[in-house]
Amino acid sequence: MDSPMKRLILLGLILINCSFVFADTLTLKSGHPDSYVVEKGDTLWDISAHFLKDPWRWPKLWGVNPQIANPHLIYPGDRLTLVFIDGEPRLVVKPHIRKSPEGRKMAKDGAIPAVNLALINSYLIQNRVVDRDWFDELPMVLGGESESKHHIVGDVIYIQAELTVGDKFGVYEKGREFVSYEEGEDLGVEAILTASGRVIESGSVSKVRLLSNYRETVAGTRVMPIEEDSLMPAYFMPRAANLETPARVLASEKELREMGKLDVAYIDKGSIDGVEAGHVFSIYRDGVDVVINGSGQPVLPNERSSYETVLSSVSSDNSIKMPDVYRGKLMVFKVFDKTSMGLIMINERPVRVEDKLLTPDALLVSE
């Protein structure tokens, strides 16, 4: 190999290495403060938004170890100061010590969470996506001691199964059935929690007393064990998702046509695809195909004639795909087998069903 070729290869390797370093470097927000005093109601994401262009990368700003369950706890009143360590921005904490008028140390308010758990607590407990056939085989509510069609807190309902006295169950109604965007694969059925109750009498038909209601409970709904504590993650460590194939927005939890910041969405990938709680995706709208008509002019999809639509589908020579359009960021907070639920943390444009979910640009390479 001649010397110029060697130099060219070496230059290419240097450029690749530099691009890795660039992608891994935190970008500070223009006009960021040098320090910040934590306030009650803040989240780690909110605080990082004062300093970072990509606030979801707050673990790197704190220099946390992702293997530690609670790598960093900060509290209202703590002062955060921006410093640079080996050229990288970091936040260091000066703890605030609360004292009583007598000078005694007082207990701190609760630690600041990664995201506002109040936004997702109900979804963590109430929503599941399960196998359709499995759901249909669950024990069924037959009715109740009262002759009412609807049952509320304090009522006793009858379950078509022998259950263990003292066990706690959730009552679920069947919601939407989900299929994948491209293959039409069955992804499961939405199970919506209507009530919770405890078994008070066992038999071929068991009795359950309702302890809480989210919706009115009716005959035909299904019951399954509810384990509220196991469904509540103590900590979300945001990190880049990196799947083999793009995910898609499957549905809006509230069945909205368009979603914005802090709305909850279902996506069409789950644990079997490698999705985990804390995974962050960039959201994109597919770029449209522009057709070049007989006059050599570009025609958008909503302006095409029937002929131009057919032409675009049979000949790529007359169709040009526009770039995908960035919509925002989504963080997964609950994972099922084939689907997951995520919170839209950033949105620059409205998010819709079928929007594409990709690895965030800032972390296309491993840290």
Task: Pin down the residues of each PLM region.
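Positively charged n-region of N-terminal signal peptides that target proteins for export
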Residues: M1-L8
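Surface-exposed, polar/charged interaction patches used for macromolecular assembly or partner binding
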Residues: L8-I9, F22-E367
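Hydrophobic helical h-region of N-terminal Sec-dependent signal peptides
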Residues: L10-I14
